[in-house]
Amino acid sequence: LWLLILLCGKLAVAQDHMYSQFFNSPVYLNPALNGQFQGDLRMNLIYRNQFTSVPGGFNYLTASVDYNIPQFGGGIGLIFTRGNEGTAGLTKNNIAGIYSYSVGSDDFVLSFGVQAGVTNRTVDYGKLVFSDQIDPRLGYIPGSPTNAESPRFDNRFYFDAGAGVNLALSDFNIGGALQHINRPNESFTGTPAKLPMRGTAHVSYRWDLNKDENLDEDEKSFFIPSVVFYKQSTAQSINIGLQYKRHNLNAGLWVRTAGSGGPSAITFSLIFDLFLNKESGEKFRLGVSHDAPISGLNYSNTSGTTEGSIGYETTLPSRTDAYHKFEGARRCYDFY
């Protein structure tokens, strides 16, 4: 019953998933972060298994690739996101292109990004259980008929767009994004059901723990506190936490609140950077995190939420001597 109520809520008022490892899905967080990295080519993959022990599952995956264009400090990119929710197989696939551009100096970088793509949303109504299929004594009988009216659609395509902005200034990084700005219609029934816009705001501070200013950047240690705020229709959440970054290790502790009555959680994250060739900037990033609910949901019933991520970044041989804008400025990638 709990799962059916949750699924019905998803059908009635769609709500985007958000990743606890937002720093390992930067393009999903904000399209203005597209092309904002040290190398030439970056690829990210992140998977979220939400409420692990709930039947049907809530599973999400995002894959992105972005290409840094040094002449204007931005880039072009492509992002694919897939979500599968509940026993009825409510599935959403989105693919979008991203373009970003930056202005600034050796003291700051202000980036702008736009995103546009196509979403396909499907549901298998044959897997739903209605009240007239439940026997008072025997419960649900598989294959029993129902008088529930069939929907007009079980498959829907629509255009979707978003935009974002990000500012890296000194030891601060602050940004915001707005998704679904065209309010696409997601309805399966024919009655309009416009997808609410999703607003995101994020801010981070990089606290240098080193007394020796002559240390190389890779040898330093940092505390990086961050706040991420999401709002979509009446749903909202605030993610507050701290990362400790040293050498190839990045460890984090986060608290997420979801408003009155919503599920709150504590998140632990651990990230490893594996440098294959430091001179060329080639590296792998491996990340894992786990959310443990502290209110709204019972951990023993859900088993929490687990995420895994993989990132790869490299410099292309043909561009090793390419000119990069804003060489002296702090960049957004310095904050994760």
Q: Model-derived features: where do they sit?
A:
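Transmembrane beta-strand segments of outer-membrane beta-barrel domains in Gram-negative
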Residues: 43, 56-59, 133-179, 185-191, ...
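Active-site-proximal flexible loops/turns
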Residues: 37, 124, 187
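Sec/Tat signal peptide C-region and signal peptidase I cleavage site
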Residues: 10-14
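Outer-membrane beta-barrel translocator/channel fold
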Residues: 15-28, 32-33, 41, 48-57, ...
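Sec-dependent N-terminal signal peptides
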Residues: 1-9
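Detector for outer-membrane/organellar transmembrane beta-barrel domains
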Residues: 162-184, 192-247, 252-256
